[in-house]
Swiss-Prot record:
Tissue and organ expression note: Component of the acid-insoluble and acid-soluble organic matrix of the aragonitic skeleton (at protein level).
Full protein name: Secreted acidic protein 1B
Keywords of the record: Membrane, Transmembrane, Transmembrane helix
Source organism of this protein record: Acropora millepora (Staghorn coral)
Chain positions covered by the region annotation Disordered: 1-74
Amino acid sequence: SDDESGDDENGDDKDGDDDDKEEDGEDVSEEDEKADVGDDGDDDDNETGGNSDTNDDVDYGDGNDEAREIGDHSIQDIRDLILDAIHNKDGGEMDADNPLQNLPYGPDKLKELYLRSGGSHFKGQLLNITLGLGFCILFLLL
């Protein structure tokens, strides 16, 4: 009881030693004593307890370009694509010769999705325009 802790009934330290210090002299606060719950088994520095099953070791999307690309689109875009797939206008008929026609959304939606994901309006024509302007400036300087 009180004799073990070294405190009298008022909570004062009656034996003179500092009960908040470990045997080696380091200060130990009550928070540190409560926080010392052990290794949670993960590779991180967050020790949350013995039976923690938090999958902190998994890095989702790293090395997966498709996952990053999907992450660039808004949730509303993905919802719209799903709704378009549900309300497929042509009744699900497929044309093996035209893969774009097999998609449940049209060319306009594809273009919008392409532009929202950072695509260029020029789609490769930018190189031709740049080379053309470069040659014009070169001939003007000669």
